[in-house]
Amino acid sequence: MKLKIILALLVITSIISCSKSPILIKDAESYSSVYIPQAAQYPYKANVFVLDSTQRYNINAFFGGSVAPAKDIHVTFKIDPNLVDTFNARNGTSYSLLPSNAYNLVKQSATIPAGSFSSETINVDIITTTNFPPFTPFILPITIESSDAKVQKLVSTVYFQITAAYSPGNIPRTQIAQLPKDYESIFSYNNAIFEHAKTGEIYRFPYNAATNAFGSATAIDNSGWGTSLQWLCPLNNYVFGMGVNGSPVGTAYGYLYVYKILDGGITLRMDGFTGNPPFSASYDMMIPFKNSLLFRSSGGNSMRMYNTNGSFTLGRDTLLTGSWKFNSIFAYGDNLFTVDDKGDLVQYPLTETGKVGLPTKIGSGWDLYKKVFAFNNDLIGIDQDNKLWRYNFDIRGFWALKK
């Protein structure tokens, strides 16, 4: 609605400015009003960085009518905190007013000169620091008033939505662990990170929620694991392992087994996973997603989803669309995240029926790591020295690890 009003006003203004003689427009007085053209973008999104910096945005006043004003029109701009509640009620949000020390309305008055349609530019400075909260939207309503002309109420307020993100190359990270050995697979399970080493050992890195930190690696009983399993991946309260080279004894290549890791560190092998599809060496990656297991074909040309139906039976087999030639693929909420050889972090919405949504690039520079995976809401990267680095991830931001 706001955009339609502004388009109508601009069309009239354009017609008048191109005409050599006056044009009479019926009810022209109804279009003669002042407004903020930036208010057509609702909200007006201002993306800033978590830096000690000032980032400037511009607004102005505009006169819409069949003819330019015959006299100067004076307007004032002001911050109206009461409109934050109005915005939240209308949009179902709970945003807060941008703190007063985080903005500066450089000038609060402007003039639309006689014979003109636009005022001078008003600068709005958004002031951030390294302590500015990232990924937390704030609202800054700036409204216009004038005693010289009618104000078009629907476009009289621009709602700045200010959201800060980390600047490229300045994203904080924390080293949480050093892997004892090269990994075959690595995953989060039961509030810990587990490494399945290439030499067969299983290491556990426990997470302490009270201290928000990980403990040292502990080797757990790996009876029945060793090199007899190609991959391990968690799903719900269990860990799935794929047999390799006829191991465990008497099984075919690719047979799935179900494990549970007890508090004491003992692993139990349950019955073989029933309803096994014809797994073979053509799969090179196994990924858990909600109640399903995803298997990527060797090289990433395709990927299949097998629904477990919440039990130990593989059900529906769905071929996912697209190519999956990525260095890392992992589930994150209702999405699959991927990292390609260029380091781009990309989000693919995915349904439980296997429908893949359109990709969105949400990061770059992630080729710093040879593997990336999720732990709760955070992302973990494994560097070339097998160090684990943790990012307090938020899907609302863009995560550029390099400048």
Regions found by a protein language model. Name each.
Residues S14-S17:
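C-terminal motif of bacterial Sec signal peptides marking the signal peptidase cleavage site
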Residues S19-P113, F117-T121, T128-Y183:
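Acidic/polar, low-complexity intrinsically disordered N-terminal segments immediately downstream
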Residues Y159-A209, F398-K403:
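An edge-strand/N-cap motif at the start of beta-rich repeat modules
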Residues G169-Q178, A213-S223, T267-P277, F312-G322, ...:
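A short beta-strand motif characteristic of beta-propeller blades
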Residues T174-N190, S223-N237, G272-N291, T318-G333, ...:
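Repeated scaffold domains used in trafficking and secretory/extracellular systems
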Residues S185, N190-H196, N237-G243, S247-G250, ...:
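Short beta-strand elements that form the blades of beta-propeller/WD-repeat-like
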Residues T199-P206, N245-Y259, G299-N307, K342-P349, ...:
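Structural motif
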Residues Y207-T211, K260-G265, N307-S311, L350-G354, ...:
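Short loop/turn segments that connect beta-strands within beta-propeller blades
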